[in-house]
Amino acid sequence: MSDSELSRDAERFLIHLTVERGLAANTLAAYRRDLHRYVAFLTSRGIARPAQVDEITVRSFIASVSASTHGPDDAPYKTTSVSRVLSAIRSFHHFLVGEGIVAHDATSEVVRPRVPRPLPHPLGVDEVRRLIEAPDLGTPSGLRDRAILEVLYGVGVRISELTGLDVDDLDLDGGFVRVVGKGG
């Protein structure tokens, strides 16, 4: 990093992360990379002091990260990586405000990129069978656990629906369970 006020504050922040927050080495290395890149971006735009950074500049930086590539195959950055970079920059700006270096957090209105939630991977038939057969039926808790697993798999209820079931919801003669689903 250059010897600007901004780069000195970034180094102070990294020391703070090491001493005060005790971050793991890999996390600290990621923060260091992200901050170096951020300071270089700001310096290239003539910004040398934290007080010169505004929300538009932060958004421009995040857009530049989103548009860039990395690695030997020039892969684009994933949304999760862009989100992690923003998290590091946000922590830096919170530090700057906390230390009284700036009065306003330039990241406060910057929206985190939406990270897609991965779809769950369904269990195979053999995995479900082994799971249902796992409880020890010789114990009351084993019988309970087996019943829970049978209802979860056989009926397809949500956990919240299952935990809301009462004995009155069971009709053993008719062979059904009354479940009040989401939304009543």
Where are these regions (language model features)?
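Conserved catalytic core of the tyrosine transesterase superfamily
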Residues: 1-184
